[in-house]
Design a protein with these regions (language model features):
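Domain-level detector of nuclease and nuclease-like folds
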Residues: 1-130
Length: 130
């Protein structure tokens, strides 16, 4: 799991440290200081939960969604209902692009498997619950 390149991304170390193990959501909160001020940490906009969540930059949200869909299916790890709602939205709002397809091809050449959510963007709609 830890070495699977389909869910590992280079990132700003400060943003990664702040993110920790927080679930993803759109938040009411503050920007992450440092090189990734488009990321935010705070409370989920749609719930009354006081737990912190992490909001990635808009241009990376679809990539995050597809990586987590892959991880959930590949390693049989459930995604919470509230997080899944955001991920499904982000997958549609930030569709697969050429750079993400190329990354999928490169990873295939290294570890001999693909992220099917990149190859088949319609796949999340066919899965009821991650």
């Amino acid at each position: 799991q830890k070495s699977d390149l389909h869910h590992l991304y280079p990132t700003d170390s400060r943003a990664n440290s702040v993110r920790g193990n927080y679930n993803f959501a759109e938040v009411n909160g503050s920007s992450v200081p440092g090189n990734c001020e488009a990321s935010r940490i705070g409370q989920d906009r749609r719930t009354t939960s006081r737990s912190n969540r992490f909001e990635p930059p808009t241009e990376h949200r679809g990539n995050v969604a597809r990586a987590l869909f892959y991880f959930s299916v590949r390693y049989q790890i459930a995604i919470s209902e509230s997080e899944e709602t955001y991920l499904r939205e982000w997958h549609l709002q930030d569709p697969v692009d050429a750079r993400e397809r190329e990354r999928n091809n490169i990873i295939y050449n290294v570890q001999l498997n693909r992220n099917p959510f990149i190859d088949y963007p319609e796949l999340p709609a066919k899965i009821q619950d991650f």
